[in-house]
C-alpha cells in the first residue's frame, strides 16, 4: 500500500510540475488587458485595491455580544453569505454552530440574531453540527422582512424580522429527504422559493466527498409557499452550489462545481419547463448573486488547477485523495498552493463574462464564497475564514 501511495504522489508531482505554467494567470497585467488564459470574451482584470474594509469575527465588539462566554465563542467559521436586509442593515452571516449573526456597528459589533436548532445551548462543538445546523444561502423577503436560508443539514428554514429560533419550511421533496440544502432565491411575485439540494447522499460536513465522488444526484427545487408543495425542476446535477433567479423571474440559474457549468431552467415564457447551459466558468463556482441591474456575480472557490483536474479525472482518484490527504492539504492543493480570490460578473442577458476581479496573491482577501453588489459596494464572504470584506467601487 505504501509503495502505491508513493507512485501516486510521484505521478501527481510530475503532473503538477509539467502543467504549472499552463494554468497561471498573470497577476501583473494592466487593468485594461484581458485576463490571462481567460482571454477574449472572458472580461478584464479589475484589481482589488486598498479600498477594502475587512471585518472579522476576531474583534470589533464581538465580546459585547449578549450571552457570549469563553465556552461559546462567537466565531467558529462562516458560511460566506453576507446577507443585507430590506432596510439596508447588516450584513448577516451564518456560523458553524448554527447561529446567524448580525453586524450592528462598531459599538456592538456582531450580535446573535437567529439560530437553526432548539438545542442552541449545546451547540459549541463541531461534533454536534448536524444537530445544530449550518446556515447557508441567506435571502430576505422584502415584503415581510422574513429571512429565509438553506441549512446544510436541516433543510430550508425561516426566521422573522426580530430573529430567534428559525422554523423549518421544507426538508423533503417528492418523498426524498433534502440532504444538503445550499443557496436559494425568492420569487416574491410567484410566492415561490428556489433552492439547490447538492447531494442525496452527503450533507455539508462531507462537502468534498459530494463533488469529488462523481455522483450526479444534485437537484434544483421549486417550493410553492401557498400550496406548500415542492418539486424538482432540474435533476442529475453534479454538486450544484450557487443558485439565483433572473431579475424578471423568467429563469433560474444553478452552478455545478466540478463541470464549471451554469445551468439555466426556464420558469416562464415559450421555453418554460426546459433547461440549457447559460455559461461556462473559468473556475469552480461557489455562490451566485443577481445584481440590481440583472447581471450576476459568481464567487469562484478556486481557478482550475492541475490538481483539481487530476482529482476529477475519475471518481476513484478523488476518493483516493480524500482518504489519504488531510482536509487542509486538500484545500491547499485545490487552490493551486496559494489561497486567492476570484469573482466573475456574468451578463444577465447572454451569460458572457463582463468582468473579473482577482486577488491572485490573496493579500486583500482569499477563499471567497460569495459576492453581493448593493449601492455601489461589493460584499464578500468566506466559507473558510471568519471574515467579511466590503469593496467600495465608487
Curated annotation (Swiss-Prot):
**Originating species:** Arabidopsis thaliana
Task: State where composition is biased (Basic and acidic residues).
Answer: 61-73
Signal peptide (residue range): 1-21
User: Where is this protein chiefly located?
Assistant: other
Q: Which residues are glycosylated?
A: 67, 122, 196
List, alphabetically, the Gene3D superfamilies matched. Answer: TolB, C-terminal domain
> Taxonomic lineage per UniProt?
Eukaryota, Viridiplantae, Streptophyta, Embryophyta, Tracheophyta
Protein name per the record: Protein STRICTOSIDINE SYNTHASE-LIKE 1
Query: Where is this gene product found?
Result: Vacuole
- Family designation: Belongs to the strictosidine synthase family.
Give the record's GO CC terms: vacuole
Amino acid at each position: 500500500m505504501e509503495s502505491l501511495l508513493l507512485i501516486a504522489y510521484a505521478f501527481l508531482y510530475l503532473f503538477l510540475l509539467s502543467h504549472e505554467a499552463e494554468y497561471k494567470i498573470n497577476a501583473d497585467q494592466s487593468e485594461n488587458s484581458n485576463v490571462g488564459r481567460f482571454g477574449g470574451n472572458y472580461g478584464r482584470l479589475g484589481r482589488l485595491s486598498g479600498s477594502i474594509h475587512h471585518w472579522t469575527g476576531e474583534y470589533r465588539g464581538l465580546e459585547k455580544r449578549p450571552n457570549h462566554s469563553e465556552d461559546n465563542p462567537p466565531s467558529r467559521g462562516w458560511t460566506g453569505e453576507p446577507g443585507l436586509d430590506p432596510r439596508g442593515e447588516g450584513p448577516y452571516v451564518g456560523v458553524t454552530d448554527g447561529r446567524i449573526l448580525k453586524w450592528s456597528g462598531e459599538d456592538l459589533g456582531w450580535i446573535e440574531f437567529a439560530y437553526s436548532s432548539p438545542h442552541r445551548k449545546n451547540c459549541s462543538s463541531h461534533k454536534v453540527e448536524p444537530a445544530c445546523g449550518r446556515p447557508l444561502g441567506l435571502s430576505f423577503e422584502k415584503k415581510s422582512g422574513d429571512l429565509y436560508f438553506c441549512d446544510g443539514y436541516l433543510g430550508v428554514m425561516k426566521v422573522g424580522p426580530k430573529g430567534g429560533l428559525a422554523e423549518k419550511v421544507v426538508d423533503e421533496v417528492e418523498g426524498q429527504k433534502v440532504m444538503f440544502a445550499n443557496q436559494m432565491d425568492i420569487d416574491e411575485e410567484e410566492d415561490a422559493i428556489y433552492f439547490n439540494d447538492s447531494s442525496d447522499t452527503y450533507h455539508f460536513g462531507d462537502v468534498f466527498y459530494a463533488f469529488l465522488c462523481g455522483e450526479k444526484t444534485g437537484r434544483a427545487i421549486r417550493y410553492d409557499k401557498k400550496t406548500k408543495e415542492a418539486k424538482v425542476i432540474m435533476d442529475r446535477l453534479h454538486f450544484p452550489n450557487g443558485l439565483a433567479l433572473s431579475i424578471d423571474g423568467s429563469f433560474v440559474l444553478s452552478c455545478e462545481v466540478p463541470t464549471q457549468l451554469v445551468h439555466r431552467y426556464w420558469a416562464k415564457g415559450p421555453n418554460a419547463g426546459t433547461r440549457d447551459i447559460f455559461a461556462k466558468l473559468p473556475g469552480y463556482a461557489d455562490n451566485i448573486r443577481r445584481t440590481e441591474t440583472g447581471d450576476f456575480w459568481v464567487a469562484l472557490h478556486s481557478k482550475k488547477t492541475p490538481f483539481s483536474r487530476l482529482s476529477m479525472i475519475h471518481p476513484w482518484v478523488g476518493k483516493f485523495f480524500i482518504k489519504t490527504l488531510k482536509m487542509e492539504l486538500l484545500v491547499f492543493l485545490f487552490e493551486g498552493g496559494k489561497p486567492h480570490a476570484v469573482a466573475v460578473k456574468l451578463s444577465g442577458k447572454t451569460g458572457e463574462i463582463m468582468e473579473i476581479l482577482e486577488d491572485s496573491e490573496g493579500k486583500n482577501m482569499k477563499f471567497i464564497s460569495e459576492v453581493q453588489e448593493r449601492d455601489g459596494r461589493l460584499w464578500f464572504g468566506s466559507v473558510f475564514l471568519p471574515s467579511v470584506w466590503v469593496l467600495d467601487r465608487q
